[in-house]
UniProtKB/Swiss-Prot annotation:
Belongs to the UPF0178 family. It comes from Burkholderia vietnamiensis (strain G4 / LMG 22486) (Burkholderia cepacia (strain R1808)). Pfam families: DUF188 (PF02639). This is UPF0178 protein Bcep1808_1605. InterPro entries: UPF0178. CDD domains: PIN_YqxD-like.
Amino acid sequence: MQIFVDADACPAVIKDMLFRVARRTGICVTLVANQFLRTPPSPHIKALQVPAGFDEADARIVELAQPGDLVVTADIPLAAALLDKGAHPLDPRGNWFSRENIDERLSTRAMMEQLRSAGIDTGGPAPFSARDANAFASQLDRFVARHGKP
């Protein structure tokens, strides 16, 4: 089992949690982004820079992820592709993407895009909070306890 991170928009506090998990457990954490990322020195932490371009990081994550891997992303279409591969997508707020909720999330995303293209201000997500970080930490710990290396 590995952990991949859609790192361009991932909050720093989430990356720090993942770095601690990598050092503590030996699970490989790979950050994928279209910009240079500084990572702490560890044989279990890697940064993979992809060319700039629409969905380049997403395509590389789909290519690399295997069944059973954890992928941290807020990208709904990426999460859908990962579910098809048998990976486990988790957003940085601690919410799992699943077969049961992905269609609804894709539909909501499409509706919001239509509203925005019609000129309607749909707002955005709430600011990332300590509660979000705690929810992510809880889900990460549970996942690693169930699926991670001993």
